[in-house]
Amino acid sequence: MNWMDIRIGQGYDVHALVEGRKLILGGVEIPHTRGLLGHSDADALLHAITDALFGAAGLGDIGRHFPDTDPAFAGADSRVLLREAVRRVHKAGYAVGNVDATVIAQKPKLAPHVPGMVANLAEDLGIAPERCNVKAKTNEKLGFEGKEEGIVAQAVVLIYRAEAAEQD
């Protein structure tokens, strides 16, 4: 494998915290008084990772594949969308190498839920858990995250040409 067989994608997502919604991050339902507002389940972490995958493979972005104007995706489970993104990345000739992601939320404390998020990512991406990393951060009470108005997720993924992996 040479460096031309490796690609990197970056993803970002943000959703407002609102009453009356479940808080789902990394496919894990997290007990909290508010959840994220969105057309689907609003899982900002999985949306950022999905966006990073599409970007790395040169396939556009999450909105192109799963538009929030399409009623078919209303209330969609973001784990299903992530698995479909992985399928499309594989179809484009790539395999997932690893993911590194950060979730920024003042509250609730996310660290206790990170192992569940990592397990879900490993399952959905089809890679070992040690190739999935999720970091939980606060924003030190600064900005809209710090004021508990919303949650941000950022992700970086590495993919590689699947044929190159088979040749090694």
Curated annotation (Swiss-Prot):
It catalyses: 4-CDP-2-C-methyl-D-erythritol 2-phosphate = 2-C-methyl-D-erythritol 2,4-cyclic diphosphate + CMP. Binds 1 divalent metal cation per subunit. Transmembrane segments: none annotated. Its EC number is 4.6.1.12. A divalent metal cation binds at D13, H15, H47. The record marks H39, T138 as: Transition state stabilizer. Pathway: Isoprenoid biosynthesis; isopentenyl diphosphate biosynthesis via DXP pathway; isopentenyl diphosphate from 1-deoxy-D-xylulose 5-phosphate: step 4/6. CDD domains: MECDP_synthase. It is an enzyme of class 4 (lyase). Keywords: Isoprene biosynthesis, Lyase, Metal-binding. Disulfide bonds: none annotated. GO terms for molecular function: 2-C-methyl-D-erythritol 2,4-cyclodiphosphate synthase activity; metal ion binding. Pfam families: YgbB. 4-CDP-2-C-methyl-D-erythritol 2-phosphate binds at residues 13-15, 39-40, 61-63, 66-70, 144, 147. The keyword Hydrolase does not apply. InterPro entries: MECDP_synthase, MECDP_synthase_CS, MECDP_synthase_sf. One of its GO terms (biological process) is terpenoid biosynthetic process. Belongs to the IspF family. Involved in the biosynthesis of isopentenyl diphosphate (IPP) and dimethylallyl diphosphate (DMAPP), two major building blocks of isoprenoid compounds. Catalyzes the conversion of 4-diphosphocytidyl-2-C-methyl-D-erythritol 2-phosphate (CDP-ME2P) to 2-C-methyl-D-erythritol 2,4-cyclodiphosphate (ME-CPP) with a corresponding release of cytidine 5-monophosphate (CMP). PANTHER family: 2-C-METHYL-D-ERYTHRITOL 2,4-CYCLODIPHOSPHATE SYNTHASE, CHLOROPLASTIC (PTHR43181:SF1). Homotrimer. This is 2-C-methyl-D-erythritol 2,4-cyclodiphosphate synthase. The lineage of its organism: Bacteria, Pseudomonadati, Pseudomonadota, Betaproteobacteria, Burkholderiales. The gene is ispF.
